[in-house]
């Protein structure tokens, strides 16, 4: 089994609904996601992994860095915490397998309430990661291209689709 197949299997064994391995060329980057964050997200200026935070790189600064990776494991779950926990576990495993620059990202589900909501610093800075849109990835266009499910929700009761990514050097 190849090392990347190991991570695919790991994602599924950790509860992911889907996991696919792609290249950075399969990821759709679009700096307009920054506008969607700025004018569409209730966490703008508050969330600890928000691109509005001082020092957070802009999407157009991050794209060239992310394109240096050789592959990207996309993890899909209907439960945000499962997607994030799987991406963390795979990031850790890949690191110990020798992929020192491995990097995961997902919408944050670490704390029940983000410390940023209270104007405090992140309680889990070693685990907190940026979301797709905060680094300039059009998650809708990307997952559509990969034939994975995602559509805007009309009602809060509709089933959600959450995505995480693990950027790999293998």
Where in this protein do the model-derived segments appear?
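Auxiliary alpha/beta "docking" domains used to position bulky ligands
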Residues: 2-170
């Amino acid at each position: 089994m190849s090392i990347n197949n190991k991570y695919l299997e790991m994602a599924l064994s950790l509860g992911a609904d889907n996991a696919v391995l792609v290249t950075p060329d399969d990821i759709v980057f679009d700096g307009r996601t920054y506008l969607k964050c700025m004018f569409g997200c209730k966490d703008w200026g508050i969330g600890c992994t928000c691109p509005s935070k001082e020092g957070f790189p802009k999407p157009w600064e991050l794209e060239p860095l992310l394109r240096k990776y050789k592959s990207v494991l996309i993890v899909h779950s209907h439960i945000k915490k499962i997607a994030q926990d799987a991406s963390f576990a795979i990031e850790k495993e890949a690191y110990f397998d020798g992929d020192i620059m491995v990097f995961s990202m997902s919408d944050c589900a670490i704390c029940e309430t983000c410390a940023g909501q209270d104007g405090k610093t992140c309680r889990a800075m070693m685990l907190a990661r940026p979301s797709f849109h905060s680094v300039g990835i059009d998650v809708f266009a990307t997952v559509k291209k990969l034939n994975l499910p995602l559509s805007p929700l009309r009602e809060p009761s509709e089933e959600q689709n959450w995505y995480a990514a693990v950027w790999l050097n293998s």
